[in-house]
Every structure is written in C-alpha cells, then in structure tokens.
Amino acid sequence: MLFTAHQIQTIREQALGMDKHRQVTPEVLATIYDHRLFHLFVPDELEGRMTSLPEAARIFQESARIDGNLGWLVTIGAGGGFFASLMSREVSRRVFAHREAVIAGSGMPTGTARQVDGGFIVNGSWKYCSGSTYATTFTANAVIEPGFTVQDATGELTADQNQSLIRSFILNPGQIEILEDWNAFGLRATASHTISAVNAFVPFEMTFSLTETQGYENETIYQYPFLPFAQVSFAGVAAGIAEHFLEAAESLATQRGGSSHVVGKLEERKAALEQSVSDFYESVEGSWEELLRNGELSNATEAEITARSITAAQTALSCGQQVFPLLGLSAAMEDAEINRCWRDLQTACSHALLRSF
C-alpha cells in the first residue's frame, strides 16, 4: 500500500471540506508531492518516479479508493508527464524538474495560433482543465492559422497551406486566466475550470506536436498509444471510487440493519466489480508485456484495452446505479460519505473515454 494509515485518515477527514469548498487542501497536495505522484511518468533524471502503466493504474485506483478527488487529480497530474518525451530535453527539465511541477490543460483544439517572429500568438479558451488552481505549467492545443509555417522537431520549416494543423502550446500561469466555472455535482475539488489565453506569446521551443518524440525514446511508457493509456488511467480511477462506494454502502447498510435484498445486491456488485477489475488488469499487464517484447501494440491489443477499460468503468458505474437507490434518504444527504462517492462515480464515468457510445 502506497499511503500510510495516517495519510488515509487525514485525507478522508478532509474530504467533506474539500467537497464543500470545491478545492483540494494544502495537506492533500503535500501528500501528493511527497509521494511524487504527479511524476509517475516523468523520467528519473527530471525528479520523476518512472512507473509502469499497470503499477500506475493500481496507484490511481488506490488513490481514488481513498477519495475520488484525490484519485482524479493524481491521474490527471501524472498524465501530463506523458508530454516529457514530446518536448526538448531542455524544456522538459524546465517544466518538470522540481517537486511541485504539474501540468494542467486540455487536448481540445479550441484555440488559435498566429505565427510571428520567434513563435506564435495564442488565443482561446479550454474547458475542464483539472488541477488548474495549482498547476505550474499549462498546455493547450490550438489550430495554426492557415498560410503559415511551423517548425518541426529538427527546426526545419514545414508548410501548412492546405489543412488545419493542430499544435500544443506550453504556457506559464501568468499567461492564463482561470474562469472558475467547474460547478459539477461530483469531483468538486478537482478545479476542472475553463482556462483562457489572450494574445499570449509562445516561443517555438515551447510548442510541440503530439506525434513527434523529441527525447527519452527508450522509456517504455512513451511508446504506449495515448488513447488506451488514457482509458486505462481513467478506468483505474472509476474502479477505486466504486470500491469506496461499496465500502460506504456496506457500512450504511450495516448501521441500518440492511435487508437481505440490499445485502445480496451489495455482494453481487462487489463480485462483478472484482471480476471486471481482474480482467482489466490481466489485459493491461498483457499489453505492457507485449510492448516490452515487440516495441508496439497490435491493433487487436489496443482494441482489447479499450474494451476492458470501458467495461471496468461501466461495471464500476453500475455499482452506484444499482445500489444507491436501495440505501434510503440518509444516502441522499450531500454531506454523507456515500453521497459524495456516488456523485464522484457518476462524474468520473461521464468522461467520453469511458463511454461505449
């Protein structure tokens, strides 16, 4: 187990306050920093703690089992380390090589970039940027305005006349305005706000392409396809929140002298979740072994990872959907632990990558 009993107790004691005030506490952030959880996919030489995907998914699950906000923030923050291989080594060191380094941002290309001498002028807004209030760096995707050129990883200019080119831009907090609009009913403390940039100048070296590796090519995690990587990460969170939900439901049912129907449904959902999570990790570990062996994943393996991730998340979601209505009015109170778990579970499983449609 990664977290100590004292850390788990502290986080859970602060969970209600985080939910009410919609922000993570300094103590919880300090725990994340102490364990270097935002650096699970950052090379060791950049003060990272490079971790295999199967191990990281279990860390995400363990974090989310303690508290949904913790699990989500750890997962999103760690995921930003994936970009270390897409930046130059000098820029990667600048971005990642300190204790509190963490990226927030968005993959949606809802900004524009106009080329100027030495770089780009970036404008736009990007939704759902988890961790926005404590991020040390922001990344955002923007469409290069037609008729301009961009530099590739070799420094050569590449024409962009006939198609929209999307590029990723590295911005510092001083270039970003945070619009505090994350009013979701779950994962309230994740600060998943909209960010905006107005006429922000970004030098060429502070941009990157999601398809061009610039360093750390030998790190296995950077060879893992990004879509299944993200799905595995989010599925781990969903599983952890569902486990916490079932724990809280069992405790509540025991206090209320739950009927055999409620107890039976709890046991049924626990068994279904355990089987689904077991199948999920079997596939994740198999894919990691395949990557180590072959240097790439087959299309069939990628499809299997996607399917197993979605199934695990949907099974996790079903725990809330099938058990929550059986728990009575006490579960409907927003300050109840079970209510918070239920809301977090619904919110996490609403992510587009965890849906089958």
What are these regions (language model features)?
Residues 325-357:
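Glycine-rich phosphate/cofactor-binding loops in nucleotide/flavin-utilizing enzymes
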Residues 7-10, 241, 245-248, 272, ...:
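Amphipathic, well-ordered alpha-helical segments in soluble domains
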Residues 72, 247, 251, 278-288, ...:
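Charged/polar positions within long, soluble alpha-helices
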Residues 26-34, 38-135, 149-157, 161:
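Glycine-rich flavin
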Residues 119-199:
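FAD-binding subdomain of flavoenzyme oxidoreductases
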Residues 240, 267-274, 306, 310-317, ...:
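Generic structural signal for well-ordered, non-transmembrane alpha-helical segments
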